[in-house]
């Protein structure tokens, strides 16, 4: 019998990392990251990645392993994750894939088409169009050919908006359609999605920001902005980078920066929940508002596991 694969999805601060670690310890599994921001090195505190204590309790993969200057696509993550999962299972161990990036889970379970390389002149024209038209008009134009991408991509995400348009311009096909085709990378998987009550989730988001400041998030942002990277890179869009960078430049107080980051974290969690409800409607839900309750709910669905 092939080693098990468990998928654990959930919004930020929902408790999914704690559940994944407990499951890994109970089953002997290794943990694979499916969070697009926890990929990047130097942002462990800001992205709530695993620390030395967690990594000592179970092997973790694809956390903090990518330079922020190297922006990864969904396809690149899928190739890396598929290799890691195959290696873990080849050694006879189960796998827990955990994160909050819905596109990663969709690519893993439904497949991802090989998207042709976009010519440099098409990329340049998309970027120029964005600057000329502005985000609102550019998004409206994108919605005419790829409404799913236009609705899904977060405000201010120039890179993904341009990417969606340039793929259509180069291929004549919507990026959203291409992302739905291809062979699944894994089979015979089990999944849960965490969706604690909204008030408890938001309170946890707020508390987490204060803890991040105490644990060194400002120092991480200071080191990141000192590199003068392209602001369109994915790592530069991590929640807290823009807000804390404004404080470090003397443009706002620390209190105001924390409040702004808390608000953006809640918005991000809401977008993740919306994605889960639309794209993971068939995944069993864990709705408890604490780690113990979530673990009990999980065990009820996995009677073969022992606490």
Curated annotation (Swiss-Prot):
Coiled coil start-end: none
One GO term (biological process): tRNA modification
Site positions per UniProt: Interaction with substrate tRNA: 101, 123
Binding residue positions for ATP: 10-17
Catalytic activity, as annotated: adenosine(37) in tRNA + dimethylallyl diphosphate = N(6)-dimethylallyladenosine(37) in tRNA + diphosphate
Enzyme Commission designation: 2.5.1.75
Function, in words: Catalyzes the transfer of a dimethylallyl group onto the adenine at position 37 in tRNAs that read codons beginning with uridine, leading to the formation of N6-(dimethylallyl)adenosine (i(6)A).
Name this polypeptide is given: tRNA dimethylallyltransferase
Species of the source: Phenylobacterium zucineum (strain HLK1)
């Amino acid at each position: 019998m092939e080693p098990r694969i468990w998928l654990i999805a959930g919004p930020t601060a929902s408790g999914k990392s704690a559940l994944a670690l407990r499951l890994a310890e109970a089953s002997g599994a290794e943990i694979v990251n499916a969070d697009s921001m926890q990929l990047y090195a130097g942002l462990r505190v800001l992205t709530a990645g695993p620390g030395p204590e967690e990594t000592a309790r179970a092997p973790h993969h694809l956390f903090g392993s990518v330079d922020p200057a190297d922006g990864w696509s969904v396809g690149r993550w899928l190739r890396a994750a598929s290799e890691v999962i195959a290696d873990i299972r080849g050694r006879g161990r189960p796998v827990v894939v955990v994160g909050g990036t819905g596109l990663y889970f969709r690519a893993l379970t439904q497949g991802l088409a090989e998207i042709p390389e976009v010519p440099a002149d098409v990329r340049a024209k998309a970027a120029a169009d964005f600057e000329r038209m502005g985000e609102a008009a550019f998004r409206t134009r994108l919605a005419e050919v790829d409404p799913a991408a236009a609705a899904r991509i977060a405000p201010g995400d120039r890179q993904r908006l341009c990417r969606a348009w340039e793929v259509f311009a180069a291929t004549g096909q919507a990026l959203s359609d291409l992302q739905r085709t291809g062979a699944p990378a894994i089979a015979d998987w089990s999944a849960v999605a965490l969706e604690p009550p909204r008030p408890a989730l938001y309170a946890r988001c707020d508390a987490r920001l204060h803890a991040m400041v105490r644990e060194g998030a400002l120092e991480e942002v200071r080191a990141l902005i000192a590199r003068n990277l392209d602001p369109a890179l994915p790592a530069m869009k991590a929640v807290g980078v823009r807000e804390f960078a404004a404080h470090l430049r003397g443009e706002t107080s620390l209190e105001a920066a924390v409040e702004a980051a808390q608000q953006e974290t809640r918005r991000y969690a809401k977008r993740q929940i919306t994605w889960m409800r639309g794209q993971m409607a068939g995944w069993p839900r864990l709705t408890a508002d604490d780690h113990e309750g979530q673990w009990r709910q999980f065990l009820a669905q996995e009677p073969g596991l022992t606490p």
